[in-house]
């Protein structure tokens, strides 16, 4: 019961019934060569991934938000990151990230650093309504970007590596925060974020 005619089973029978010791990898190679089994699909090679980086600062910003724990509750941390330099333009703590907050932090960062040529984000509702089924028109950020003549780019659904730079930044930030006592308030979390950046 539960045994098949795979390499491990064949190795067991050869060893126990015929006294022959052979590696499972050898049996597998022979079975594949004989066309008796299909090789398992392999992972995509790293070389097949299309890596990109903006050529200049302010060519493209990436943005995302993540959840962080407080001593008694949760908060959300919104990040704006320059794709070329990986400079954290803005890292802010909020009870909940909303469309107006996204626009406020974006316009403040633009006033401080100059606006980017394009913005890359995931498909969260605070960034785009393109998957909202046509309800409600454009959101706050989409309207602001059109008014400023800034190109908006999105990752494909279920492809978080497209926004990998900001995702990696947030992963590092969360590890750094986890090594410290949990803040009690949004203001205390913001003080920690200011110390990180």
Q: Where do the language-model regions lie?
A:
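Basic, flexible linker segments flanking DNA-binding modules
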Residues: 1-60, 65-68, 136-139
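RNase H-like DDE/DDD metal-dependent nuclease/strand-transfer catalytic core used by mobile genetic elements
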Residues: 20-21, 55-62, 67-77, 83-195
């Amino acid at each position: 019961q539960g045994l098949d005619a795979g390499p491990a089973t064949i190795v067991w029978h050869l060893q126990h019934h015929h006294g022959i010791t052979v590696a499972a990898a050898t049996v597998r190679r022979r079975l594949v060569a004989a066309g008796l089994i299909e090789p398992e699909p392999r992972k995509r090679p790293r070389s097949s991934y299309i890596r990109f980086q903006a050529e200049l600062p302010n060519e493209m910003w990436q943005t995302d938000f993540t959840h962080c724990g407080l001593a008694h509750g949760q908060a959300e941390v919104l990040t704006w990151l320059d794709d070329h330099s990986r400079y954290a333009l803005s890292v802010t703590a909020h009870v909940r990230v909303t469309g107006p907050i996204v626009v406020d932090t974006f316009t403040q960062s633009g006033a401080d650093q100059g606006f980017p040529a394009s913005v890359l984000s995931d498909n969260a509702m605070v960034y785009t309504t393109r998957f909202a089924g046509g309800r409600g028109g454009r959101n706050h950020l989409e309207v602001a970007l059109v008014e400023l003549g800034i190109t908006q780019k999105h990752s494909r659904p279920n492809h978080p590596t497209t926004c990998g730079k900001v995702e990696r930044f947030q992963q590092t930030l969360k590890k750094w925060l986890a090594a410290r006592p949990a803040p009690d308030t949004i203001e205390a979390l913001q003080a920690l974020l200011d110390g990180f950046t």
